[in-house]
């Protein structure tokens, strides 16, 4: 994927309402959906609780945006129109109840944490705090626990089996290094690496050098406003702010 890529970010679109044919006509090369894991509460029609889409309770396809069958249909439509399909994924945390706790809807098998997971991050330039502590009230999952890793990697396979080409990895800078390496390996194994990238925004430049397992975007300028899409120059998504 060395040519310039233009991604249409279908933020909070229902899968069966994404205008695939029109997106292709406008010159986009990929469509990115919002996360598709089930959320702790229904998403309101006016989207005043859209934040809930980033608070999953499991690692299975299906929420208010669509079912696994909707995703398969979307993938087929994308591929028929020469587009790749990217899905936003949330691996750092599961849903909370109110803050620094866990939603009662989350099953016990997903409740594996670090010793400091329920303490808020204070220093965002400290790699240990970034990866082992709570992100704004969302406790960090223990991504070195095999039950968690297996559940998440099974979710990636579900996405691949549905026709997804790659992933946008939410809160990438908050994932522990050993997990990031395994995640990159899994994406390669599934054939999803080329169209996957990690979110690393507002990170110290020195820390950015550590996030070299997969391509990144590292500033807000790569995410357009008004849900119109992100223009990402591949050659590993490099730009003036991200030479790594």
Segments the model singles out, each with a brief description of its role:
Residues 95-150, 217-218, 225-244:
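Glycan-binding loop/region signatures in secreted carbohydrate-active enzymes
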Residues 10, 61, 171:
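Short glycine-centered, acidic/aromatic-flanked micro-motifs in structured strand/loop junctions
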Residues 35, 69-73, 84-106:
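Active-site-adjacent structural elements in enzyme catalytic domains
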Residues 11-13, 201:
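Structural motif
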Residues 3, 37-76, 106-142:
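Aromatic- and acidic-residue-enriched carbohydrate-binding clefts of CAZyme catalytic domains
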Residues 1-6, 18-24, 28, 34-54, ...:
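Active-site-proximal helices and loops of the catalytic beta/alpha 8
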């Amino acid at each position: 994927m060395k040519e310039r890529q233009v991604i249409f970010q279908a933020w909070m679109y229902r899968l069966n309402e994404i205008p695939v044919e029109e997106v292709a006509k406008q010159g986009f090369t990929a469509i990115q959906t919002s996360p598709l894991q089930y959320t702790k509460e229904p998403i309101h029609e006016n989207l005043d609780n859209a934040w809930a889409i980033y608070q999953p309770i499991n690692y299975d396809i299906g929420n208010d945006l669509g079912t696994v069958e909707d995703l398969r249909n979307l993938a087929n439509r994308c591929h028929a129109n020469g587009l790749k399909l990217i899905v936003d994924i949330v691996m750092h945390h599961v849903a909370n109840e109110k803050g620094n706790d866990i939603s009662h809807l989350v099953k016990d098998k997903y409740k594996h944490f670090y010793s400091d997971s329920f303490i808020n991050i204070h220093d965002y330039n400290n790699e240990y705090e970034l990866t082992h502590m709570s992100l704004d009230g969302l406790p960090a999952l223990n991504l070195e626990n095999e039950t968690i890793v297996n559940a998440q990697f099974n979710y990636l396979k579900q996405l691949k089996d549905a026709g997804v080409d790659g992933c946008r990895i939410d809160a990438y800078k908050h994932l522990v290094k050993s997990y990031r390496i395994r995640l990159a390996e899994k994406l390669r194994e599934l054939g999803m690496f080329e169209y996957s990238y990690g979110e690393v925004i507002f990170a110290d430049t020195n820390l950015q050098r550590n996030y070299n397992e997969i391509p990144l975007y590292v500033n807000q300028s790569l995410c357009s406003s008004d849900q119109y899409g992100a223009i990402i120059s591949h050659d590993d998504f490099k730009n003036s702010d991200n030479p790594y």
